[in-house]
């Protein structure tokens, strides 16, 4: 972006204003790809930047969502379910039921508590649906589960 474009944005939207140069985001992803080993997968965390999905979806291997709302945005953007990692602590039976009815079990699901494990196991068994899961092990903080819970 040039100075004149930035002035126009400031005059139109006020300051402070947060601006993404989509071409720069795409260039950074390509740069990461060039610097990392060929078999390295890249995952874009949707979080507060769901508007970047149309620009990054084809450049990364996966998109990580942490809420049912973020998953819904991926559905609207027609992201293939197998490309989505469902992460975060906001997993309820109903939200996972909705997600799994759409994904048919495709994608990756993180387990961040015993409750998440129970929800995913119940829904997988009920629907005879194998799931790919990652267990988020705690390093002694409030996030994840301790290794003794599952191993």
Enumerate the predicted regions with their spans:
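A charged N-terminal "starter" segment
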Residues: 1-132
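ATP-grasp fold ATP-binding core
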Residues: 132-138
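Active-site loop/helix belt of alpha/beta enzymes
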Residues: 122-126, 139-151
